[in-house]
A protein has these predicted regions:
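Short, intrinsically disordered low-complexity segments
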Residues: 37-112
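A solvent-exposed, charged loop/short amphipathic helix patch at secondary-structure junctions
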Residues: 110-138
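C-terminal interaction module
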Residues: 19-38, 154-160, 168-252
Length: 252
């Protein structure tokens, strides 16, 4: 079985516009390996024709297995059996067990929801209750999370991404119909360069609104908009959050 993390989850999630059966899973695995997040050989699969909702529930039969084969080869073998991998286990020496999931929230939507979840540990402790050693560990874990966000958001075909403690990155339908769980929206959003001029517009809107949210150009691939930080007691900037959601609702 895939090794589970304990306690609350730190989640990095993203929406991708890509063919599920091609290389999304393998590309994500290769990217994670570059950050020393190693594939464990444990996967969960279901029938290729099955629908997997945003919560990971499949309309088909779920099957778990362990294989020493590389993930790409295992995926090919399962494909011959008309199956697809929907979860895979990874492990990082310091961050611990990690679970990579791929789901298709809406039938024939053309996009897929990818998330990587691992233990929040010290980031799950209220800021004011953290001890000195907790603060140091929390800072490392949050920086590690942001690096993962940058990595995933910068991947080809990423529409947008987000990260935070116990968060759910909303789908385009949830954004446009305002059916999001606002208490679980990302602490930081990642907007890829694929949004081009639109990305510049939203960052300018956030800055001109006087929002204290930090707009950071991480690199040529990703711009981050931080609504709140789990390292600070400063309240979430819901104005900046609303600008990001409004922007995504018009460009997707």
């Amino acid at each position: 079985m895939i090794e589970q993390y304990e306690g609350e989850a730190m989640t990095v999630g993203a929406l991708f516009h890509r063919d599920f059966q091609k290389s999304l899973l393998v590309d994500m695995a290769d990217a994670l390996e570059s950050m020393s997040c190693h594939y464990t050989g444990h996967v969960v699969s279901t029938q290729r024709s099955a629908q997997v909702d945003r919560w990971g529930q499949s309309t088909g039969t779920i099957r778990e297995e362990y294989s020493q084969e590389p993930l790409k080869e295992l995926q090919s073998k399962l494909g011959e059996r008309e199956e697809k991998i929907i979860r895979a286990g990874f492990k990082h020496r310091k961050a611990g067990p990690m679970i990579l999931s791929i789901r298709e929230p809406s039938t024939n939507s053309g996009y897929f929801l990818v998330d990587l979840a691992f233990a929040s540990d010290e980031l799950g402790i209220p800021v004011e209750a953290r001890k000195k050693e907790d603060r140091s560990s929390a800072k490392w874990r949050w920086r590690f999370t942001l690096k993962l966000l940058d990595l995933i958001c910068g991947a080809p075909d990423c529409l947008y991404a987000g990260a935070g403690n116990e968060v759910d990155v909303p789908t385009p339908e949830e954004i446009t119909t305002n059916k999001m769980m606002r208490q679980s929206l990302p602490a930081v959003w990642g907007l890829p360069s694929s949004l081009c001029d639109s990305r510049g517009r939203v960052t300018e809107d956030v800055l001109s609104s006087g929002c204290p949210a930090a707009v950071e150009q991480w690199n040529d691939h990703v711009t981050a908009i931080k609504v709140w930080s789990p390292l600070s007691v400063v309240p979430a900037d819901h104005n900046a959050e609303a600008i990001v959601l409004g922007f995504l609702g018009t460009v997707l």
